[in-house]
Amino acid sequence: MMSTMSIKEGLLVILLSLFLFDTTALIHRREIPHMESKGQMQRGQVLLGGWQERSPEDNEILELLPSVLTKVNQQSNDEYHLMPIKLLNVSSQVVAGVKYKMEVQVARSECKKSASEQVNLKTCKKLEGHPDQVMTLEVWEKPWEDFLQVNILETKVLSSV
């Protein structure tokens, strides 16, 4: 016969769960909203698993950018490789790995695509006469699996000045 949990045991389980939740947040140095806030977060609080703004100068992200552009160029039907000009905005979310939302200013380079050769975008020069673009990308990285997925969410052509 199955035994039922007493009220005291149930309360103990709830209290233990809340303690573990607060401890996990503390370990990860993240602030959590209190139960009484009824879903409203205060300035400076971070939602666990939520999106966080990142600096476009963050070395971790700058090191990832060439691989991201390689994936973008694989998806593009353009005859020329796109090259990064400037990383405009970045936010990240911890999931099974890390998801990034990036806004990257890119330009068409003088380097033509060829199935047989690997291109180093750092050596490519900007192809003049073509406007830059701002691409909004969603990037999912799981480095322990050597996994990188890039989705192009939006592309805007910048008007030439």
Swiss-Prot record:
Q: Please list the disulfide bridges.
A: 111-124
Q: Which residues are glycosylated?
A: 89
Show which residues form the site (Reactive site). Answer: 49
Position of motif Important for interaction with host LGMN? Answer: 76-78
Q: Name one GO molecular function term.
A: cysteine-type endopeptidase inhibitor activity
Question: Cross-referenced CDD domains, in alphabetical order?
Answer: CY (cd00042)
Residue ranges crossing the lipid bilayer per the database entry: none
The coiled-coil regions, if any, are: none
Pfam families recorded? Cystatin
Residues spanning the signal sequence: 1-25
Task: Supply the alphabetized keyword list.
Answer: Disulfide bond, Glycoprotein, Protease inhibitor, Signal, Thiol protease inhibitor
Q: Provide the family line.
A: Belongs to the cystatin family.
In Swiss-Prot or TrEMBL terms, this protein is called: Cystatin cpi-2
